[in-house]
Structure formats: C-alpha cells, structure tokens
C-alpha cells in the first residue's frame, strides 16, 4: 500500500460523483488541483510561521455545516470522508486570517514526533502500544459521560466517550489522539482509499498504536469514524 498526500482516490473521485459532492471541484482534475493547492498553502504557512495548530479535541457537531472543536461533544462520527473534508473548512467561521481543514497525514506524523520530543510520550507509546493513553478496547480509565457523571470505562469493553472527557487520554493538552473514534486524514492510501489514524474504541492499543496507518473507502460512515481538524495562518 502506497500512502500519499495530496492525491485523489481514483475509485471514488471521478467526474460523475464529484459533481454531486459539493466539494468545490466537479472533475477529477479539478479536485486534484484543489488538493495540491490546499497542501502547498499549508506547507508554505508552516515554513513561514513555524508550525500549525491541531484540534485539542476530535471534531464535534460533524453532521452540521459548521463543526466545532469542543469538549464534551458526542456528535463526532457517522459521516463520510467527503462530508468531513468539506465541513472542516468551515470551522474558521468568518476569520479570514486562517484556514481550517481535516488534518493531513504529515501533520499527524509531526504531532506524534512532537509528543516524543517534548517527553510527553515515548517512542514505544507511539509506535508499539498506545493503550496507556487512549480509549481502546483493552484500556480502563475514568471519564465524564454525556450526563456529566464520572463513569468507568472497563477493560474489554467498547465505549465511545465524549470529546476531552478523560484525563487518561490527554497528551500535551490534546485529547483522544489515539483511541475513541478513528480519525480520517487527507492522506490517500494507494489509488482507491483514504487513510485514518489513531486507532479506535473497539480496537487494541497494541495492534493499532498512534502511528499505525489503515484505510477504508471514503464513502464509508459509521460510529467508528471521525476526524481531527487542523488550522494554519494564511
């Protein structure tokens, strides 16, 4: 499997479907140019300003036209990659000085490296087993449920939790980077799939650690899939 940013996925990003997705581009060629421009603008901003901002929480209100980055949000899944891609752009609101969007694969990788560089996590916690800091099937920890009460997530249970509801899942003030919902990224897997990162609440932290890449078709939507947003200065 080859992983690439930016790129289209040919099995889904063809002209007849792009016309109906509301992505801005209506042909495969236009969409590829659009993705390349967005990627290049992000890289230019990082080079100029020295970095980017990653959402503290997984993207919430994701079934709305304008999502949010908000603690305690439970509306974090069950949308296709296409819907999340176009909606994450609206997080910036009326602010014309920044751009927001779904996180790129290289931004995800740089965030993981930053966690290691700052001593927040070890290489082993990133690459081998992320159970100790994520909402995985094999993890146990306390969290605040949607009713505002403290609850225990038991080992051997698959429990999706509200965003930012467990100190157990925090790393450098970023919550749920691993475990909870799988986070779609902008990265393409081969020529027909989109990549998601960070494991999931139904998975093992040893089998699906923070840096593990896996993929699905971008039209999939279920309780397991969400996304992480990022922001850069224009």
Indicate residue ranges for each PLM-predicted region.
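Eukaryotic short linear interaction motifs
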Residues: 61-63, 182-183, 191, 203-204
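Active-site-proximal beta-strands of protease catalytic cores
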Residues: 178-186
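Residue-level recognition of short, solvent-exposed, well-ordered loop/turn junctions
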Residues: 176-177, 224
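Short aromatic-cysteine micro-motif
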Residues: 3-176
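Disulfide-stabilized, aromatic/cysteine-rich ligand-recognition loop
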Residues: 78-92, 98-103, 168-169, 190-234
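Structured loops at beta-to-helix junctions and adjacent beta-edge loops in soluble globular domains
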Residues: 3-6, 13, 55-57, 187, ...
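Extracellular interaction modules
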Residues: 1, 48-49, 220-225
């Amino acid at each position: 499997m080859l992983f690439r940013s930016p790129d289209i996925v040919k099995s889904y990003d063809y002209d007849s479907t792009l016309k109906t997705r509301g992505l801005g581009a209506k042909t495969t060629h236009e969409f590829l140019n659009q993705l390349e421009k967005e990627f290049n603008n992000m890289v230019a901003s990082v080079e100029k300003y020295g970095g980017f901002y990653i959402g503290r929480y997984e993207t919430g209100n994701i079934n709305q036209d304008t999502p949010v980055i908000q603690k305690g949000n439970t509306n974090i899944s069950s949308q296709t990659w296409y819907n999340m891609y176009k909606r994450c752009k609206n997080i910036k609101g009326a602010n014309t000085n920044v751009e927001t969007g779904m996180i790129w694969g290289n931004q995800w990788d740089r965030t993981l490296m930053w966690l290691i560089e700052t001593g927040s996590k070890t290489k082993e916690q990133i690459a081998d087993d992320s159970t100790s800091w994520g909402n995985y099937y094999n993890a146990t920890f306390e969290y605040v449920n949607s009713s505002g009460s403290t609850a225990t997530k038991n080992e051997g249970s698959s429990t999706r939790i509200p965003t930012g509801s467990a100190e157990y899942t925090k790393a450098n003030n970023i919550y749920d980077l691993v475990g909870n919902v799988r986070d779609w990224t902008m990265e393409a897997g081969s020529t027909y799939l989109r990549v998601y990162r960070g494991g999931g609440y139904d998975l093992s932290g040893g089998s699906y650690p923070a840096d593990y890449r896996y993929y699905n078709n971008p039209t999939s939507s279920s309780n397991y899939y969400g996304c992480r947003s990022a922001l850069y200065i224009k």
